[in-house]
Amino acid sequence: MDDSLFYNMFESRMEQDLLKICRNHGMLENHLLQSDDINDKWNSYAPEYMAQSVKEIADYPTVAIAWAAYIGMAVACWWNRDWDKLKDQPYSVLQGERGFDDMDEHIVRDILGLQLEGAEAKKIENVIHSCAEHALGLIRREGIEPQSKKAFYVYARTEQVMFKIGAAIELHRL
């Protein structure tokens, strides 16, 4: 199987698996809600996000994978709120006081406007954690050599799916 076919199949399988997890948690229905505007924003954030998250993957793999979903939620929130005004937000706006480390809390509290200890925030945290754990399991089952070109591309596809999942969750919440 050629690499691009492998990556496409991996991404499709992951998207379907994560959609099922979100459905089981009552966070999505039968398809991913999407917008080209939102999906395109990943392309501008991905280089900075990937540069930060790759450093965390060895010690905090679920965090490194999960935070892309929170970015998707933030972008979907902006898209709904006032896209013309908010579409050019720099990546740095997504980071909390501790940078990458508290990005999730910053997005939930300061962008989505939820109380961190509230039921909705906890539900979001649980589903994103479940998705990230499942994604990590899928990556590991592939038996790809760590730090290889193939590992990077699989990781990049994983992050893109997580971003889409987060965006879909937020669009569904609205």
Regions found by a protein language model. Give the residues of each.
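Intrinsic-disorder/low-complexity detector
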Residues: M1-L174
